[in-house]
Amino acid sequence: MSKIGLGILTYKRPDYFKECIKRIDNSKINEIVVVNDGTPYDFDVPYHLIQHAKNKGIGISKNDALKYLQSKDCDYYFLMEDDILIKDNNVFIKYIEASLETGIQHFNYSQHGLMNKKPGTEIPNPRTRIDYKNNVSIDLHMHCVGAFSFYTKRCLAESGLMDDFYFNATEHLDHTYTIIKKEMHPPFWWFADIANSNQYLEDFPWSPSTSTISQSNNRSEIIAKSYEHFTKKHGHHILQTPNLPLDQVKEKLKQIYKNK
């Protein structure tokens, strides 16, 4: 029987964290780990806790969660930041079913924040939708958002974990690009999510003032260094990553499907 693991990332937002975990149906998940990258909370955490002694950043925090879940020999891995709320706990099986049908080994929830929504609305704005058999459909979005992510065991085995260099920016973009290069995800700028994912997940009411990363005093410097590292690593600036036409994207999806 397949084993599902969930890693929850939190940083100095006890109220968010409490609401986040309150929405989780433990019967849907085999292993849960919490990584607290900030000061300890003054209440008990009901799951295995990795408490950092100092702020290590989101890249290392996500890796710590994934390493713990790998030690438990999970087959499917989910990472969730503390400002994501579960609306329907069938979300886990929906991502797994989509992976099994399409062959795509990695998905990111697209509807966190505003980047993949129609301007001024909460309506998803995918570049296209692809329909498969067995009532599975996926949406492909322009922007890669890393607040809720799915990986298979195969994906992590072949692509490795996140680059520890990234502190509070770009870690998910770099990792997803690595997975794309392994041909387990559609091309860059066509980021995969299950169709209608906003029926299963939602954001905690968000604004720049509630984002611990957006409020960082050296946010611009962190982003600049992350883009510089990405450029050295991949040979081009992140914004120069090729944006393939839809017909080529569909051919890539066919190849991923054949290799599942």
Residue ranges and their predicted role:
Residues 131-151:
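A recurrent flexible, glycine/aromatic-enriched loop bordering the glycosyltransferase active site
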Residues 165-260:
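C-terminal catalytic/acceptor-binding lobe
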Residues 90-106:
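Conserved donor-nucleotide/metal-binding helix-loop-beta segment in metal-dependent transferases, i.e.
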Residues 107-122:
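Short beta-strand-to-loop element that shapes/binds the nucleotide-sugar donor at the catalytic cleft/hinge
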Residues 13-26:
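Short, well-formed alpha-helical segments that are part of the catalytic scaffolds
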Residues 53-69:
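Glycine-rich, basic loop-to-helix element that forms the pyrophosphate-binding segment
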Residues 74-85:
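Short beta-strand-to-loop acidic/aromatic patch adjacent to the donor-nucleotide binding site
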Residues 34-44, 85:
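A conserved acidic beta->alpha catalytic loop
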